[in-house]
UniProtKB/Swiss-Prot annotation:
InterPro entries: ExoRNase_PH_dom1, ExoRNase_PH_dom2, ExoRNase_PH_dom2_sf, PNPase/RNase_PH_dom_sf, Ribosomal_Su5_D2-typ_SF, RNase_PH, Rrp41
Protein name: Exosome complex component Rrp41
Keyword Repeat applies: no
Top-tier EC class: hydrolase
Location(s), subcellular: Cytoplasm
Quaternary structure note: Component of the archaeal exosome complex. Forms a hexameric ring-like arrangement composed of 3 Rrp41-Rrp42 heterodimers. The hexameric ring associates with a trimer of Rrp4 and/or Csl4 subunits.
Pfam family, one: RNase_PH
């Protein structure tokens, strides 16, 4: 990762980040549930300018028999960045990164999905990054968790995600693209606070042992807030469907 000083970019000044946030501040977060009527479950999640749409179909019988698992449902995840999601031109064909992140998101969700209740079926999760400004994988995990809940898939708990970065020696929560580009480290984390499980933990860059422990604690505090927002989005959706009755 290139240092911001070498690039002439100042990302931390007087304790505030380039967009005015304090180190532990999230970007403005917006969540909507049930926005695609042809899907069994759907959600739109926004962290600042990063926008991810999730759609869930299933449980359903697979078209190809090799997807069948005798004791549980197969969870299939497709992460895709829309060609217009970044400033650079992008091929519509799946890239190596998209294939890798599809696997990352699937593995972050599998610990909470009660797939054993639907043997010999598949649950498909489609994730479309509509706009990318950092933190797309953790936003995708969050959107997928919401869409699974909206589809009525039994889950042990909701999963939320956030990335912690190290910028000019300062640990910060919910990094955007500029911070990711010029930061010294980036640590995406996903967790299910209600059952005390971490389902995703990656690190790009170098942190000391103390920095790692601090960054993880910061991530988990932020994820607590993200999951509470998920619960509120689900509650609001059910109230709207039920005509506003508690």
């Amino acid at each position: 990762m290139a240092g911001p000083a070498q690039a002439g970019v100042e990302l931390i000044r007087d304790g505030r980040r380039h967009d005015g946030r304090l180190p532990e501040d999230l970007r403005p977060v917006r969540m909507q549930v049930g926005i695609l009527h042809n899907a069994d479950g759907s959600a739109l999640v926004e962290f600042g300018r990063t926008r991810v749409l999730a759609a869930v179909y299933g449980p359903r019988e697979p078209h190809q028999r090799f997807y069948v698992l005798p004791d549980r449902a197969a969870l299939r995840v497709r992460y895709h960045m829309a060609p217009f999601s970044t400033d650079e031109r992008k091929s519509p064909a799946p890239s190596r990164r998209e294939i890798e992140l599809s696997k990352v998101v699937r593995e972050a969700l599998e610990p909470v999905v009660l797939a054993e209740e639907f043997p010999r079926t598949v649950i498909d999760v489609f994730l479309e990054v509509l706009q990318a400004d950092g933190g797309t994988r953790t936003a995708a995990v969050t959107a997928a968790s919401l869409a699974l809940a909206d589809a009525g898939i039994p889950m042990r708990a909701l999963v939320g995600g956030v990335a912690v970065g190290k910028i000019q020696g300062v640990l910060v929560v919910d990094v955007d693209e500029l911070e990711d580009m010029y930061g010294e480290a980036d640590m995406p984390v996903a967790a299910a606070p209600d059952i005390g499980e971490i389902t995703l933990l990656q690190l790009n860059g170098v942190l000391t042992g103390e920095e790692f422990r601090t960054a993880l604690a910061m991530a988990l505090r932020a994820i607590d807030r993200v999951v509470e927002m998920e619960k509120e989005a689900i509650r609001k959706s059910y109230l709207e469907v039920g005509g506003g009755q508690e």
